[in-house]
């Protein structure tokens, strides 16, 4: 009999709510109050999220972010900057002790990302796992030249035709794995790169050309319109098949929303945003 996990779709929300909900669910799974959870969500306004270890004022053009009315939030996970707009965002929250979850981060990535792989298959795309093949590729992951996510594929992220199509980040806290990531419906590369600081315009253009060669969205792969609703259905079924689980739709309770409202203040605070 398949194990039952909870499924939550919170749709579009502000960036502080999105990050607070991930943390609240992590806490509840850690306490044993909830079984493993898969959540889908979106962003309003469109938002630049930065990794836990990124240096805000060194890497991000805050004037452009503010002038454009973008949301801005620091994630609890590592990785690089992501502009969240036309995408389906997912999070998987599961105990480290779960029999399905390997101890190593990269191996756990592969298990969780199997759900993404099956989701892309449901949409008709032959995605595959990226594996950095050379020592140079592996070293580059440790010391990335770019602040922009999707500029390179990490271990077991998803690529189509050699280009990264889903970017994910993972953290482990309180005995729980939280992996969340972006599945790109479409992307505006010029808009994305305008939000980051580069030492010269020449470097910016070079990095942008490199990005075009390494990243792709669903809209780049097909003339058919793939809606967010179609993506939700494809990846819902993909996670069920890839992880061999049964998803049970779950409505967020008032108690969970109360914890989220407290955590929102953390993610909204200058202290959290400017911690590095």
From Swiss-Prot:
Residues 32-247 form the BPL/LPL catalytic domain. It catalyses: octanoyl-[ACP] + L-lysyl-[protein] = N(6)-octanoyl-L-lysyl-[protein] + holo-[ACP] + H(+). It is an enzyme of class 2 (transferase). Pathway: Protein modification; protein lipoylation via endogenous pathway; protein N(6)-(lipoyl)lysine from octanoyl-[acyl-carrier-protein]. The record marks 164 as: Lowers pKa of active site Cys. CDD domains: LplA. This is Octanoyltransferase LipM. It comes from Macrococcus caseolyticus (strain JCSC5402).
